[in-house]
Amino acid sequence: VDENKNKIISVLNSRGVRREQLDSETLKDIENIISACGTEPIKLVGYWGVGEKQEPTEIDRKALDKLSDIMKMTDDRIKVHLILADKHGEFNGYENDIYLNKISSIAGERNISTAFLSAIYHEVGLDAADLTNVSDDIWNKFPECYRCIIEKRAGIHQKKCEASEDAKRYLHMTQVEKQKIGAVYPNCIWFTYGDIKNLKDLFPRPVISIWPIKRGKSVLPWFS
């Protein structure tokens, strides 16, 4: 077990995979998950977004190859699972199941499992009102440094509202999903392609930020 644990942590904390050194709390969380899973594979779960493009490109394929490589490097002790974020796309003004269906197919060829976010919403009883009825309570409970970072990022890839409104909605959505979607995936390690420095509280724990294709190249495949 210790050998498997060390191999998994070594891969996830390698310079070619993670964007930043994993801190002691994250490492401890990962160790606990590995222990809890015993001989079962550990799920590495992340959202895969959607934008305007209809067809997956070479960037998508290379990013999926990278996720497949992570599984291979751990001798399949890690299994990658993608949440295809059709609902996020819908909220941002993109309704593009064609692209996500093709991503699901390409991922399957690499033994990467997928689930549509809309199906998970249905499973846990979430609807649009839960995500769009945004109050200031969640926004105000986060420190100003969080809010400033989120406001700077808001509005870049959405077409429905102003950046300030989008920032509040995004923060609200992350907290609802953190509780509801996180419960569907217990004992999992989460990943994101974004920079999570100072923003780890937005995600289920533990969460790691990984390079999508290669070290030093930061892109969101669905927008590239």
List each model region and its residues:
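N- or domain-start disorder-to-order transition segments that initiate the globular core
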Residues: 1-41
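Flexible, charged surface loops at secondary-structure boundaries
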Residues: 32-41, 71-78, 203
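Short hydrophobic beta-strand segments
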Residues: 38-47, 81, 209
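Anionic-ligand binding region
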Residues: 41-44, 61-64, 78
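Short acidic, S/G/P-rich loop/turn micro-motifs used as interaction or catalytic elements
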Residues: 48-55, 87-92
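Histidine-anchored nucleotide/phosphate-binding helix
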Residues: 55-75
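Short internal beta-strands
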Residues: 79-87
